[in-house]
């Protein structure tokens, strides 16, 4: 076991529970365990987590206590979008050393089942995915994690390193959806995943791109990220089919009813909302595809006959696999820039304020990140 410099701050984490409380309290491993290395298992490293993004799923676990069958049953630590510094390594770890900057891929698959052995470890039924109950998450000052799932990020900022997790979600969608250069693409939802998917689709050569949302502010933010994106504000008083007509108009400068009107070949659905999925289905061309990234309710109504008579493929994804090295290259080489996405930053001790900001649409927050050190907050904001 090798360690970095002596640390003084106690380990604390951000918890929720079945009563939907949210609080900060002491966490494992303890500072004493970090200093001694006694909590490290073979193959693990200790990471001082420097930056963690708040995901919509974190807010949902706090407010609702569950996502589908994943249920909070006791005191539970949130967070799975993290980057930090390696401060200790087990004796059998040779490719990482104290001082290395890493992004933490928050899953621990079994490495023995068919999905794992065929390279699709996101399908591992025994996977331990950090922040998904009952597995505690990364919103802690220190965490032990298998070294194989800690990816070196070089001089990349910890902010960008934490954003590699949602970027991985969008990269999985881009790859599995079959997006090609020049494809007209619809992105539904201008939240963090939708915005990162917009950046990814543009980098992959999609053109033109229309992005939708119910919030004018988020559409304006999308325009600031990708100036040539076309925006469409979803009208909540209209049917999914009528909103689709407006979307097709947006692709065609208001001439969506013309015989030769362009329709998207691919819709990347980033909300999981029933009406948005339906609008995407009504929008795409004959033989097109609706690829659902967003997580929605257990059951929803969709226009089945539209799918059938238009030969529209409806496809889904579950997390990601084998995306992190590519995500790192894309960010480090400037192909995708994530720098504008973090709009609010808070210290770990102020996690309640951070979550309240992330959960309140009135704040205009895009991505809220929680940082372990005051200098990280000040440095990132500068």
Curated annotation (Swiss-Prot):
Gene3D superfamilies tied to this protein: Medium-chain alcohol dehydrogenases, catalytic domain (3.90.180.10), NAD(P)-binding Rossmann-like Domain (3.40.50.720)
Protein name, per record: L-arabinitol 4-dehydrogenase
Gene: ladA
Role this protein plays: Catalyzes the NAD-dependent oxidation of L-arabinitol to L-xylulose in the fungal L-arabinose catabolic pathway. L-arabinose catabolism is important for using plant material as a carbon source. Also active on ribitol and xylitol. Not active with NADP as cosubstrate.
Keywords: Arabinose catabolism, Carbohydrate metabolism, Metal-binding, NAD, Nucleotide-binding, Oxidoreductase, Zinc
SUPFAM superfamilies per the UniProt record, alphabetical: GroES-like (SSF50129), NAD(P)-binding Rossmann-fold domains (SSF51735)
Binding site for NAD(+): 192-193, 213, 218, 293, 317-319
Binding positions for Zn(2+) 2 per the UniProt entry: 110, 113, 116, 124
Sample GO molecular function, one term: oxidoreductase activity
Reactions this protein catalyses: L-arabinitol + NAD(+) = L-xylulose + NADH + H(+)
InterPro entries for this protein: ADH-like_C, ADH-like_N, ADH_Zn_CS, GroES-like_sf, NAD(P)-bd_dom_sf, SDH-like
GO biological process: L-arabinose catabolic process to xylulose 5-phosphate; L-xylitol catabolic process to xylulose 5-phosphate; sorbitol catabolic process
Pathway assignment: Carbohydrate degradation; L-arabinose degradation via L-arabinitol; D-xylulose 5-phosphate from L-arabinose (fungal route): step 2/5
Cofactor: record remark: Binds 2 Zn(2+) ions per subunit.
Species assigned in the record: Aspergillus oryzae (Yellow koji mold)
Top-level EC class: oxidoreductase
Binding locations of Zn(2+) 1: 55, 80-81, 165
